[in-house]
Amino acid sequence: MPHFVINNRFQKLTKSRGVRVEHILTDEILSDICRRITGHDDFTCDFIDAEAEGRLAVLHYGNRVAYISYSPHEVGGRNSYFQSVPTAMASFYEELNQRKNLYFYFVPSIGSSYETLYHLFMYRLMLTAGIDFLNDEDYITRPIHPFISPDDLINARDRLSGRNSSNNSTYATINDYGGIDVFCKTYGASKYESTLLSVALAFLSDQRINVYQILEQNLRLLPERSRNIISSFDNTNLIEADYTMERIEFEEGNSLRSPRYLYNLLATLGPKKCALCGCEIPELIQGAHIWPVAAIKRIRRSIEEKIELATDGNNGLWLCENHHKMFDEGIISINMQGFVDIRPDMTRFNVDFIDWSTPSRQLRPHILTNSFLWFLEKRYEVPA
């Protein structure tokens, strides 16, 4: 007979209210879960007097095992809604029985929305990462489909970020070599989204996936179990983007393209798109410094302050290779009103080419922040 094993004590707030898992996962709900997985309504269940690691039920039947993550039963933040999913995923990956499946089940919720744009994106991410839904048709009014390619996933993430960039902490993009870079914040609820995003991309792509853990001064990594999941894929490369890496890159060259700089550009400017011609081919788009790294190295500041300036998201533009080269060589410049100026000694033929290849001759207003203009002023400042 199918048998559930479930830890009965919730973590955090619900613990003080006397709510236990058995109050949420009632016999009716467990019977429904059992029927949807095994085809049978009857089951046995052990509620263990132990603290639950997230919202997880484990069902043993025959020689198989099912891990079931379930939705919260009360209102919470959008990230907290999904933070138990990677925990269930970690337990699933640690399971030695290879005849196993990972599921998600919707439980009735008090005052919660199941269909915000963020929820729908995360559902697609979960499907792509190998999680099957048991009863989505009872709660979701539109069909949910997994992503079909890395570009499909990244574009959907970018559209979501554009609507609510203040809450965005995990980014993915195609790099110069055609591989995939994932930039992860490693604290708070963001770390759970980082795990799901990385796993989904690993399922979708045969290309190399660099997963950068953007570490702050406390040097906090992704949870060990999340790191183990990500590292279990042959095409993933888990990298600690810490201060030591930034310092080495800063000191060894003048064209800093560090993970933190790219992360900050994505956070400040959004997805890769040339500011002057609109090219959106990510392999061709580069982060162009406004105040050059070589100039920053020469100022009298501490090394920490110099790195902070060199990796600031306001100290840069997304430019295609063509416009980046013209900008660095001084063939074109940007004035304090955001207009593109062409060097006066250029031939008429070359001016015509630049005009033709630069349909956007003025930067968009949202780029021209006070911080950006400060870096622009520094670019053209004559050294004392």
Q: Can you annotate each of these PLM segments?
A:
Residues G287-I290:
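Histidine-centered catalytic micro-motifs used for acid/base chemistry in nuclease
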Residues F250-G253, R260, A267-P271, C279, ...:
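A detector for short metal-coordination/catalytic motifs
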Residues M1:
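Carbohydrate-interacting/catalytic domains
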Residues F4-R36, H40-L262, C279-L284, T358-Q362, ...:
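A boundary/linker detector
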Residues C274:
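The canonical Cys-X-X-Cys-His
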